[in-house]
Amino acid sequence: MAADLNLEWISLPRSWTYGITRGGRVFFINEEAKSTTWLHPVTGEAVVTGHRRQSTDLPTGWEEAYTFEGARYYINHNERKVTCKHPVTGQPSQDNCIFVVNEQTVATMTSEEKKERPISMINEASNYNVTSDYAVHPMSPVGRTSRASKKVHNFGKRSNSIKRNPNAPVVRRGWLYKQDSTGMKLWKKRWFVLSDLCLFYYRDEKEEGILGSILLPSFQIALLTSEDHINRKYAFKAAHPNMRTYYFCTDTGKEMELWMKAMLDAALVQTEPVKRVDKITSENAPTKETNNIPNHRVLIKPEIQNNQKNKEMSKIEEKKALEAEKYGFQKDGQDRPLTKINSVKLNSLPSEYESGSACPAQTVHYRPINLSSSENKIVNVSLADLRGGNRPNTGPLYTEADRVIQRTNSMQQLEQWIKIQKGRGHEEETRGVISYQTLPRNMPSHRAQIMARYPEGYRTLPRNSKTRPESICSVTPSTHDKTLGPGAEEKRRSMRDDTMWQLYEWQQRQFYNKQSTLPRHSTLSSPKTMVNISDQTMHSIPTSPSHGSIAAYQGYSPQRTYRSEVSSPIQRGDVTIDRRHRAHHPKHVYVPDRRSVPAGLTLQSVSPQSLQGKTLSQDEGRGTLYKYRPEEVDIDAKLSRLCEQDKVVHALEEKLQQLHKEKYTLEQALLSASQEIEMHADNPAAIQTVVLQRDDLQNGLLSTCRELSRATAELERAWREYDKLEYDVTVTRNQMQEQLDHLGEVQTESAGIQRAQIQKELWRIQDVMEGLSKHKQQRGTTEIGMIGSKPFSTVKYKNEGPDYRLYKSEPELTTVAEVDESNGEEKSEPVSEIETSVVKGSHFPVGVVPPRAKSPTPESSTIASYVTLRKTKKMMDLRTERPRSAVEQLCLAESTRPRMTVEEQMERIRRHQQACLREKKKGLNVIGASDQSPLQSPSNLRDNPFRTTQTRRRDDKELDTAIRENDVKPDHETPATEIVQLKETEPQNVDFSKELKKTENISYEMLFEPEPNGVNSVEMMDKERNKDKMPEDVTFSPQDETQTANHKPEEHPEENTKNSVDEQEETVISYESTPEVSRGNQTMAVKSLSPSPESSASPVPSTQPQLTEGSHFMCV
């Protein structure tokens, strides 16, 4: 039974300490014998951690673990064996039913044969097809296992999914949203079941047909990052470096936590793939002692598998292989990228175990290491040298009587390099870190020289590891001084990629930040000896399968802690550990929460669950070379604050724009309410509700104005802050540019590195600033709109097409959409440029409109739109009425003047004329169209006889009534005479206008009832235009009406009406040609008009007084 993870196992004998690997496993250190072991020195049991599981039915010293693919096997710590069969029942686990396990009986072998048995290995975990093939070939000279004859299954969907074991317990089931990997990447709700370390998903909870399966071991369960580009709130992912990334989403945060915990537990059964090893021969194998403490055996594993291809490599291929190793490539007879897993190699971590006959692994050989012997000088090569691309193997440096190791040509070359390096003395030994880079080693290196200050029997980190100028190693002062000594101020420089150097600094920070007061087990002056190669290999869980070691074997070669100068099993024996671990995973190796536990402190719970979520993928490791440089952090902070401020400014601008729109709406509603009150001034009971609404609108407008003022001030403050941050970034960029220019004059290696880093920072700043400049360019336009946001200002909307408020100026018009619906035809052509410029260029305060005598009438598209609005005037929303000025309201409060009604009639006539001209579709010029009106043509009269007759008949009654009330004799006066008469009779027009206004309202309500087909039909529009003619003509002037009535013969009613309409249209044309001229010019234009021949021949000769009347009223 393995020891429980409690305080009892911390009680160790004297000279024994413990340590914790990066993976979270606990190992024990014998300070006297300079050895390590997984087994507790008292109980003889291994400590159970998150990597292993302890079953109650296993004998003492046995442990349960999982392979890279998720197959279960058992570890015998007592005999150092691994097997896939249960030690009690002798049967394989039922969980392995989805794997093909080819176990071959191991024949009885002699002791010499056993010495040559290589370690077992797990083969072929390809990118998307996993085959668990535990073939055993004990006599294989090259340590190669057989492969399955075919792929067992492909991970994927439906038919390629893993077959679910119905007897396996279900860890968790429920609904999850999963994002599609292709197409629109939609989120689909699926029923997920987590069972037997595999995540199955179905269409519904019936669990009838498997839609897909995800084998969670080797997946990394983590929250989303900005690179994922997913905005879902409760979303997480299952990432794998060589397979697709699955994105999941839940409805609540609690569900997300539960699912992530369950999936993490399933994913953490392993961490890394294993590496293949060469066969190992041994002579003079020592006798094993209890717990293997005095003579701890360490597996020596070559870097590249010993096969025929590697043996036959040419010199060029050797060089290429070594350089590829420096870049983190695996060798399997050919170069391939780091992320490929064509062959999963067994790592050194299953190190110290031999496989039995029922074991899927092959035997392992060990050799003793006595660190007190004189051979320590050869064995303990500086760790600085081990970090280089030329990684030595210490095994061949022993005497031939100790060990005979067969290696590939590349490894022999490394051995030769080691001998040369050792012959150069300790001064050359101190240069090791320079080879700990990832660029080709044929580049020159500049090393600072310093004498070694360490005993030869210990492996250490580089002794002259002064940080680069742009990075600071945050060790404590006492440790820093004790380590570096007087010459430590010299700078270590590197011409190569800085990833590894940054990793070294990060290691130093994490291991020494809080440990200056912790006791050392010796008086050596080098606290940097706490790091060994296993520190780099013990990554958090899980990492990429291509990184070297699977979880099943990860803990077999524990690392030593900073507290001890002894070498861990891997460091002492396996000096050819896959350098990719430390070369491309600095973030995996030293994360702040993953620290070893000091001897004098209480053990803290180290769970792989807590470690796994903090790791990053291998691709991310290369992109943060100077992540912890203070200047870079400062740049990141400035850019982040600038981006956040940009968001704030954008939000405030949107809020301000919304407030402007609300303010304008309230203004329109308030003015419409005022107009409604004005129109019903003689009926206080009818306007009581409108008065209340007006009060509410006034309060709302005041509140909106206050909020608008606050928002404007807040936006200004936000822009000032934005400008300040932008200025800071600009200053920083200029300083960096100056620094870059200065470094361009210096031709040194460190200057080249700094130039590259500064250039990266400049590019990053440029990218951010260009992205923000798009919003900044719109600032000027937005501010103009805010400053000119008067009720009738159109500056703010100048880029939004025609100002929609122009359409709202029509009386009782609510929205543009209503005008469109009522018109039933396209918008009218723009009115004259003079009118448009007057409206758009005038800015008046709330509730004040331009005086009517000096500006054109409110613009509307067509006469049809006006008619539609007039016919539903009583039922229109109050805030859509046409606003009136304060002067108008004051005048109306005193008396109702007929000229107001006349002006409205003139407006309708003008709009009617525009509609007729547009209908004619001949592009007639309105200013010069006084020769003949469109309605004067015989074709128009013939086309519309029904409308003309209908209009005449409906208005005969009203005209007769008006004539009886006004006993004015008709005369054929000239326009000048008519003006004089109009001035004399103006006071009498008040009563008549009131009566006429009532008659007009009745007529409009009768004439403009909606047709069944709606107001959009062409027929309806024509009818409405004709309906408008007669009231406009008749109500134009009381005298004109009298003249028309007295001269109207019974036998020619249609001619009278037509002539009246035609001549009044001529009047409108004349008026429209001079909208802004003086009264004198208008009178001259009126006098210049003469009746056409048709009008002269007509029995009704005079509508000229109407012409003069209209001119008079529009000029006053």
UniProtKB/Swiss-Prot annotation:
<feature type="modified residue" description="Phosphoserine">
    <location>
        <position position="607"/>
    </location>
</feature>
<dbReference type="GO" id="GO:0010314">
    <property type="term" value="F:phosphatidylinositol-5-phosphate binding"/>
</dbReference>
<feature type="compositionally biased region" description="Basic and acidic residues">
    <location>
        <begin position="952"/>
        <end position="978"/>
    </location>
</feature>
<keyword id="KW-0007">Acetylation</keyword>
<dbReference type="GO" id="GO:0032266">
    <property type="term" value="F:phosphatidylinositol-3-phosphate binding"/>
</dbReference>
<dbReference type="GO" id="GO:0098978">
    <property type="term" value="C:glutamatergic synapse"/>
</dbReference>
<feature type="modified residue" description="N-acetylalanine">
    <location>
        <position position="2"/>
    </location>
</feature>
<feature type="cross-link" description="Glycyl lysine isopeptide (Lys-Gly) (interchain with G-Cter in SUMO2)">
    <location>
        <position position="301"/>
    </location>
</feature>
<feature type="domain" description="WW 1">
    <location>
        <begin position="10"/>
        <end position="43"/>
    </location>
</feature>
<feature type="modified residue" description="Phosphoserine">
    <location>
        <position position="933"/>
    </location>
</feature>
<feature type="modified residue" description="Phosphoserine">
    <location>
        <position position="937"/>
    </location>
</feature>
<dbReference type="InterPro" id="IPR011993">
    <property type="entry name" value="PH-like_dom_sf"/>
</dbReference>
<feature type="modified residue" description="Phosphoserine">
    <location>
        <position position="568"/>
    </location>
</feature>
<feature type="region of interest" description="Disordered">
    <location>
        <begin position="928"/>
        <end position="978"/>
    </location>
</feature>
<feature type="compositionally biased region" description="Polar residues">
    <location>
        <begin position="930"/>
        <end position="949"/>
    </location>
</feature>
<feature type="domain" description="PH">
    <location>
        <begin position="169"/>
        <end position="268"/>
    </location>
</feature>
<feature type="modified residue" description="Phosphoserine">
    <location>
        <position position="855"/>
    </location>
</feature>
<keyword id="KW-0832">Ubl conjugation</keyword>
<keyword id="KW-0597">Phosphoprotein</keyword>
<keyword id="KW-0963">Cytoplasm</keyword>
<protein>
    <recommendedName>
        <fullName>Pleckstrin homology domain-containing family A member 5</fullName>
    </recommendedName>
</protein>
<feature type="modified residue" description="Phosphoserine">
    <location>
        <position position="382"/>
    </location>
</feature>
<dbReference type="GO" id="GO:0061458">
    <property type="term" value="P:reproductive system development"/>
</dbReference>
<feature type="region of interest" description="Disordered">
    <location>
        <begin position="140"/>
        <end position="163"/>
    </location>
</feature>
<dbReference type="GO" id="GO:0005654">
    <property type="term" value="C:nucleoplasm"/>
</dbReference>
<feature type="compositionally biased region" description="Basic residues">
    <location>
        <begin position="147"/>
        <end position="156"/>
    </location>
</feature>
<feature type="compositionally biased region" description="Basic and acidic residues">
    <location>
        <begin position="479"/>
        <end position="495"/>
    </location>
</feature>
<feature type="modified residue" description="Phosphoserine">
    <location>
        <position position="410"/>
    </location>
</feature>
<dbReference type="InterPro" id="IPR036020">
    <property type="entry name" value="WW_dom_sf"/>
</dbReference>
<feature type="domain" description="WW 2">
    <location>
        <begin position="56"/>
        <end position="89"/>
    </location>
</feature>
<feature type="modified residue" description="Phosphothreonine">
    <location>
        <position position="460"/>
    </location>
</feature>
<dbReference type="Pfam" id="PF00397">
    <property type="entry name" value="WW"/>
</dbReference>
<dbReference type="InterPro" id="IPR040392">
    <property type="entry name" value="PKHA4-7_PH"/>
</dbReference>
<feature type="compositionally biased region" description="Polar residues">
    <location>
        <begin position="1070"/>
        <end position="1085"/>
    </location>
</feature>
<feature type="modified residue" description="Phosphothreonine">
    <location>
        <position position="438"/>
    </location>
</feature>
<keyword id="KW-1017">Isopeptide bond</keyword>
<dbReference type="GO" id="GO:0080025">
    <property type="term" value="F:phosphatidylinositol-3,5-bisphosphate binding"/>
</dbReference>
<feature type="region of interest" description="Disordered">
    <location>
        <begin position="1025"/>
        <end position="1116"/>
    </location>
</feature>
<dbReference type="InterPro" id="IPR001849">
    <property type="entry name" value="PH_domain"/>
</dbReference>
<feature type="region of interest" description="Disordered">
    <location>
        <begin position="459"/>
        <end position="495"/>
    </location>
</feature>
<dbReference type="GO" id="GO:0014069">
    <property type="term" value="C:postsynaptic density"/>
</dbReference>
<feature type="modified residue" description="Phosphoserine">
    <location>
        <position position="55"/>
    </location>
</feature>
